[in-house]
């Protein structure tokens, strides 16, 4: 089983600080819970739209999220 990526860890840490979970993120970002899980666990690369929606939902800039993604590749 693959561990969370730095991208996934960053998002999960922010969700924890906000008292929210993946289901909340899915609802607030307009993404399916399955897609959110796949992204956070590194099984699926997020689309630009998904990164944008996630950034708005958790209050982290799209630049920071994108940098984290680029650092992993």
What annotation goes with each model-predicted range?
Residues 43-56:
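Short, basic-rich loop-to-helix N-cap that marks the start of a DNA-contacting helix
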Residues 20-38:
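Short alpha-helical DNA-recognition segment
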């Amino acid at each position: 089983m693959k561990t969370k990526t730095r991208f996934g860890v960053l998002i999960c840490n922010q969700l924890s600080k906000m008292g929210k979970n993946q289901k909340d993120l899915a609802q607030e970002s307009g993404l399916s819970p399955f897609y959110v899980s796949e992204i956070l666990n590194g099984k699926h690369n997020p689309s630009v739209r998904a990164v944008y929606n996630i950034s708005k939902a958790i209050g982290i800039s799209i630049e920071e999220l994108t940098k984290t993604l680029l650092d992993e590749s």
